[in-house]
Amino acid sequence: MTTRGFSVSHADGVPFERGLRSFFEYRDLGIKAATDGRVVAHVIRAAAGAGFSSRPHRHETSFQLVCVLQGWIEFEYEGQGVVRLLAGSCVHQPPGIRHRELGHSADVEMLEIVMPGDFLTEEVAAVDDDVRAAAVIRAPTD
């Protein structure tokens, strides 16, 4: 039996740090080190006092999953429109999909899992070529 790559991460004493987006803080879960960079997983939360600004962008990934643990966050996705995620909501963002964050609650926390562990983020001019064609998708409130 092998234990290579085994990883356990506990919340106690593990700091959140600023990362890709200045309005979020990230807590590394040790998965990137355990998988030799194939996968990164972190808990993301809103940074206290940070201003919010998100430009349309895309990521060069092979897999990206976001699950909201508490609070809410709203995204605009290419070809999908506006999507609000509440606690318990998950979204798979297909590779290269253009998107932007529109807003989030002060208490938002999310689990994000991305492959590969290091990926390129590229700003783009717009989320959709025709933003008027976008639909609105909202999570149920009941």
Where are these regions (language model features)?
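Hydrophobic/aromatic beta-strand elements that line small-molecule binding cavities or substrate pockets
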Residues: V43-R45, S89, H99
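A short glycine-rich, His/Asp/Glu-containing loop-to-beta-strand
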Residues: P15-H57, S62, D142
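Extended interaction-bearing regions that mediate binding to partners or small molecules
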Residues: M1-T2, R38
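Short acidic-glycine-tyrosine-enriched beta hairpin
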Residues: G79-G96
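Double-stranded beta-helix
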Residues: T3-H10, E17, R100-D142
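Short, conserved beta-strand element in jelly-roll/cupin
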Residues: V43-A46, R58-F75, I113-P116
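Conserved catalytic-core motifs of eukaryotic protein kinase domains, centered on the activation segment
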Residues: E78-Q80, G103-H104
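Residues that flank catalytic or metal-binding motifs in active/ligand-binding sites
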Residues: E25, I97, A106
